[in-house]
Amino acid sequence: MVYKTKLGEMEISDESIFTFEKGIPGFEHLRKFALVFPQETFPIGWLLSLEDPEVGLPVVDPKLVRADYDPVVLSEDLEEIEAENQEALLFFCVLTIPPGKPEKTTINLRAPIILNQKKKKGIQTILENEDYQLRHLLSEEMERSKTVV
C-alpha cells in the first residue's frame, strides 16, 4: 500500500508495519509505524508514522554503534509486545541529527525502540541500566566500540 510519509510517498508492505499500543513518548496519539531502510540512508532506517506524515524518526541498530550494547527488557515490556523473551526481538535506537551538523549526531541508548517481528508490535521503553544515556555522541560511541570489539 502507498502511504504519505515524512520521506514522501512510499510503498510499504504489511511486514514493515508495527503497532505501538501506547504510542511513542512525544507521539502517544500515534499507533501505526513502519520501519523502512531507504538505500540512500542505510544503515540508518526510519520509523515512520502511518497516521501523521510529518512524523518520522531516524533509527539505527545499536550494535552497529556500540558493540557491547546489551539491554535488559522488563517483563512488563515483554508482555506489552507479546514476547516470551527478548532473544527474538529487534532493537533500534533513535538518532538526533542537528540540521547542518551531522558530526554532532547523538544516539539514545537509554530508550530503545523494541519490535516483536512475529506479533508486529512495538514499544519504546526506558532501560534501568545507568550506563545508557539519552544522548551519546555517535562518533564517540563508534570510536569506543573499536576498542571493545
Curated annotation (Swiss-Prot):
Keyword Cytoplasm: yes
Alphabetic keyword roster: Bacterial flagellum biogenesis, Chaperone, Cytoplasm, Translation regulation
Gene3D superfamilies the record matches: BH3618-like (2.30.290.10)
Main localization, broad class: cytoplasm
SUPFAM superfamilies recorded: BH3618-like (SSF141457)
One of the record's GO cellular component terms: cytoplasm
Top-level division of the source organism's lineage: Bacteria
Localization in the cell: Cytoplasm
GO BP term, pick one: regulation of translation
Pfam family, one: FliW
NCBIfam families assigned to the protein according to its UniProt record, in alphabetical order: PRK13285.1-1
PANTHER family membership: FLAGELLAR ASSEMBLY FACTOR FLIW (PTHR39190:SF1)
Subunit structure: Interacts with translational regulator CsrA and flagellin(s).
Family note: Belongs to the FliW family.
Function: Acts as an anti-CsrA protein, binds CsrA and prevents it from repressing translation of its target genes, one of which is flagellin. Binds to flagellin and participates in the assembly of the flagellum.
Name this protein carries in UniProt: Flagellar assembly factor FliW
Organism: Thermotoga petrophila (strain ATCC BAA-488 / DSM 13995 / JCM 10881 / RKU-1)
